[in-house]
Amino acid sequence: MYQTTAALRSAFLEFFRSNGHQVVDSSSLVPGNDPTLLFTNAGMNQFKDVFLGMDKRSYTRATTAQRCVRAGGKHNDLDNVGYTARHHTFFEMLGNFSFGDYFKEDAIRFGWTFLTEVLMLPKERLCVTIYQTDDEAFEIWNKKIGVAAENIIRIGDNKGAPYASDNFWQMGDTGPCGPCTEIFYDHGDHIWGGRPGSPEEDGDRFIEIWNIVFMQYNRQASGEMLPLPKPSVDTGMGIERIAAIMQGVHSNYEIDIFRALIAKAAEIIGVADLSNKSLRVIADHIRSCAFLVADGVMPSNEGRGYVLRRIIRRAVRHGNKLGATEAFFYKLVPTLIDVMGDAAKGLAETQVIVEKALKAEEEQFARTLERGLGILDSALNELQGDTLDGETVFKLYDTYGFPVDLTADVCRERNIIVDEAGFEAAMAEQRSRAQAAGNFGADYNAALKIDAETAFCGYSELTGNAKVTALYLNGESVPAINTGDDAVVVLDVTPFYAESGGQVGDKGVLMAQGIEFTVNDTQKFGQASGHKGTLTAGSLSVGQVLEAKVDKKLRHRTQLNHSVTHLLHAALRQVLGTHVTQKGSLVDPERLRFDFSHFEAVKPFELKQVEELVNTQIRRNHELKVAEMAIDEAKEKGAMALFGEKYDSQVRVVTMGDFSIELCGGTHVGRTGDIGLFKITSEGGIAAGVRRIEAVTGAAAMAYVAQQQAELEEAASLLKADAHSVVTKLKVQLDKMKQLEKEMQQLKDKLAAAASADLAGDAVVVNGVNVLIKKLEGVEAGALRGLQDELKQKLKSAIIVLGVAQEGKVNLIAGVSNDLIAKIKAGELVAMVATQVGGKGGGRPDMAQAGGSQPENLDAALSQVLPWITERLA
C-alpha cells in the first residue's frame, strides 16, 4: 500500500497530523539559526532553539520530512557513497517532535503503531535497543507494547566514557541530552550480521530504521545530569531505509527514486550495466547538488560552496569513467523533480537556475579533467608501493581542481592509499607563502591590541567633543605625541565610522586650541575605534578633549555608494535569482565594488535590467528606515544576513521601501533619491562562481556618463558620422576590414607557397628522411603554419623545424609527417628547441608550435635539432 517513497512520506506526515502534530515544511539545507553547522543534517536542526528554551512555537507537537546533507565537516558520508548500500550525501529524515508535551510512552507507542499497524511490518522482524539504565523505556516496551524481553537490548557506554553510547544522545559537552531507543529491522538470516550489541552488529542483517531520543537531562560542565523541567522528544527515520524495506529490496539504491535516477543517468551516458557503482554515485550526488543549489549554495572555493563543488566534480569524474563525452549531470534534474514529488516543490521553482549552475560547473571542470586524470594515471602507473605522495595530490588539487577526496576515490579503485598528511603539509606551505606575500608591507597598527571601548555617535552627528583615552606610536602605547608623529588616537566617543562591513573608515580632523590631528583612516581594534593619521600641529596627551570633525563630503559620497549597494544586491537577486549572495564588498567615496555568487558571466541585457531596476528605486525616493530588533525577528522579516558574519542578539536593520531589507551597521542616505544616479562601470569574474560589479553614483555617475558621451562623439567624428549613426558606420568599416584581411591572407598564402618551393631545396636527407631546419627572415609568425603545410606536401616524408625572431620574441613550428611520428613527435621536438630560447610549447604529434623570449639564442637552438633528429632516426 505504501510502497513508493512519495506514498511513505505522505503516510508518515498524515499519521502524525492525525495525532495532533503540526506538519512543518522541511527547512533549508543551509541552517538559518546555527552558524556552527555547515548543512542541515538532522530533523531537529530547525527546532534547536525550541529544545534549548530560546524559542517558542505555536505548537508543542511537530512532524517533518526534512531534507539533509552529510558531506564535509564532522558528518561526512562522501567517501562511502556508491560503495555501500546505505551511505548518501543527501537523505530525507522523517521525524516527530514533542516540545515538553508527550514523552517516552507516547513516543514509543507512536513509532510502534506506525510501523506495525500503518506499514504492517511483521512484529517478529523488529527488535529494539535502549540505554543500559533506562528501565522506564524497558517497562514501556515490554509491559505496554508487548515486545519480548529478549528483543529489548540494553546498550551501555560503548564509546569509552560515561554516557558515551550509541543509545545516549548529547547536543554537546553541556546542555540537553538523554537516552534513546532505536528500532531495528531484521532482513533475515540469508544476510550476514548480528543483533545490535553483538560482535557481528556491523553486518547488514539488522538495520536501524527509527531513533527516538528522550531529552530529559541538562548536562552541567561538571558532568552532573539535572532533570529538564519539560522533557522533550526528537525522533528520526531515514525514508530511504524504510522505503527499501517496504519495496522488498536490501540496498537503498534499489528503491524507486534511485532506480529512476540510475536508469536516466545510464540512458544519457549510454551505459547498459545498471549495477555499475558509478551510476549509484551519480544518482546520489544529483540529489544533494540540485537541492543545495536550490537552497542558494553555489559552487565556490570556500565553505559550503566548496563542498558542493567537490560533490559535483566527483559525479562528473564518475560520468567520465563511464564514457560521458559531454555535460550530462544537469540533465538529471527533471527526473529528480519528478521522482521527489511534493518534496521537490522548491527545486521545481528554481529548476532553470539549478540546471545552469550544474552545467556551468561541469563544463568548467571538464576542461581540466582529462589532463588531470592523465597525470594521475601516469603517477599511479609509475608508483613504487601502495601510497600516492602528497605533492602529486596537491598538484592535482592546485593545478587541475581535483579535490583530495576525488583523487582518493580514483586511488581507492586501484587499492592505492593517499598520503593525506603530505597533502596537508603542501597545503600548509602554500598558505604560508600566500600569507607572507599578503603581509608584505603590512601596517604595524594591524597588530595593535587596544583594551578600551569607543562609543559611536556618527549615525546622527558628524562633529562632537571627545576625550583621548589612548595614544599609540610605532605600535606602542604612549602618554603623548608631538608634531609630525604618525599615530593612532583612541577616543571615548566618536562620530568617525570605523571600517566595517565593506565601508571604509572615515577621514577628517581632530582639533583643539593649537592642536590639529589629520585623520587618514579609522579602524576597529576590538571594541575601540582607532583614528589613524598625523599630528600636524601642537602636541597631544591622553586625557585631553578634542573636537572630532568628519569630512562631510567624503562621508556623504560613501553613504551614496553604501545605500546603493543594498539596492544592487536586491536587484541582482530579482534579475538573476535568489541564489545570489554577497561574497564581499568595498564602499568608498569614489566607487563601490560588489562581489556575489553566480555561476556565469552576467549577460549585457541582465546588467541593463539590474541598472534600470536600481535607478527605478532611486527615483521612487524611498525613505531609509533603520530599526534595532532581535536577530530572529529580523530574519522573519526577510532581512538579508551574510554567511560567516557574527551578529549580536540585537541587530540593526536597514529597509528601503519593500525592495530591500538587510542587516547593516553602516551609514546611509536619508532617502534613495539622494543617490541621484547609479551606473555600472564593469562586470567580471574574480574566482570560480564569484562575479564582481563595480559602479559609481551621484556626481561620479554623471561624470562617467559625460565621459562616455564625449568618447562617443569623438568616435563619431573619426567615422565622419553623428552619434546616432556610429554603429552603422562602424559595421561598414569592419566589413571592409574583414574583406581586406581575407585578401591579404590569400596573398600571404601565395607567398608562402612560393617560398616553400625555394625552401624545399634546402632539405637534407638523414637515414632516408627529408629534414628541413630553417631560420626565416621577413616572415610573419602567422604565416608559419601555412608554410609548414606547404613544405609537408612538397617533401612528403619529412621533419620540418622553422623559426622566426622578431620584436624580441621567437616563434617556432615543428612538423612531422604521419609515417614518422612513431619515432619523432612534433610536440617533443618543438619543446626541446623552445627550452633553449626561454620558452615552452607543445601540440599534436604531427604539428606543434612554441614561443620564446630569447631571440639571440635561436641560431644555437636550431643547430641542436639535426643531432637530436639523427639520434632518433638511427
Swiss-Prot record:
EC numbers, comma separated: 6.1.1.7
Statement: the UniProt record of this protein carries the keyword Phosphoprotein: no
GO-annotated biological processes: alanyl-tRNA aminoacylation; negative regulation of DNA-templated transcription
GO molecular function, one term: aminoacyl-tRNA deacylase activity
Keywords, comma-separated and alphabetical: Aminoacyl-tRNA synthetase, ATP-binding, Cytoplasm, Ligase, Metal-binding, Nucleotide-binding, Protein biosynthesis, RNA-binding, tRNA-binding, Zinc
Catalysed reaction, written as an equation: tRNA(Ala) + L-alanine + ATP = L-alanyl-tRNA(Ala) + AMP + diphosphate
Keyword Aminoacyl-tRNA synthetase: yes
EC primary class: ligase
Superkingdom to which the source organism belongs: Bacteria
Location of this chain's protein in the cell: Cytoplasm
Main localisation: cytoplasm
Binding residue positions for Zn(2+): 562, 566, 664, 668
HAMAP family: Ala_tRNA_synth_B
The record's note on its domains: Consists of three domains; the N-terminal catalytic domain, the editing domain and the C-terminal C-Ala domain. The editing domain removes incorrectly charged amino acids, while the C-Ala domain, along with tRNA(Ala), serves as a bridge to cooperatively bring together the editing and aminoacylation centers thus stimulating deacylation of misacylated tRNAs.
Family in the record: Belongs to the class-II aminoacyl-tRNA synthetase family.
Protein name: Alanine--tRNA ligase
